[in-house]
Amino acid sequence: MTLTQAYILLAIAIAGEIISTGTLKATDGFTKWIPSLICILAIAICMYTMSHAMKILPIGITYATWSGVGIIALSLIGIFKYKQIPNLATTIGLVLIVIGVVIVNTMNDA
C-alpha cells in the first residue's frame, strides 16, 4: 500500500465517522431502525478503513487527523443543520484544531 492509498483510506474512515456521528442524533437512542443501521454500518466502515490506513500511517497522525477533521465537519453540521452557533472560544478552538491537523500532517515523516 502506498502513502496515497493510506490517506484515501483515512478519508473514507473520516467520511464514515462523520456519517455515523451525524446520524446518531436521528437514531433517537437507537429506536429508529434506518438511521441506526446507517450509523452502525458507517462506523464499521470507518474502523475497518482506519485500521488499514494505520498499516502505513502512524497511529498518532491517523487519530489526530481523523478526530480533528471529524470535529470540524460535525461542528459545521451543527451550525448549518441544527443552528448551533459557536461562541468565540469555541471558534478559536476549532481554528486551533485545523492548524494542528495541518501541522501534524505536513511535518509527518511517514
Predicted regions and their residues:
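Polytopic alpha-helical membrane proteins, predominantly small-molecule transporters/carriers
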Residues: M1-A110
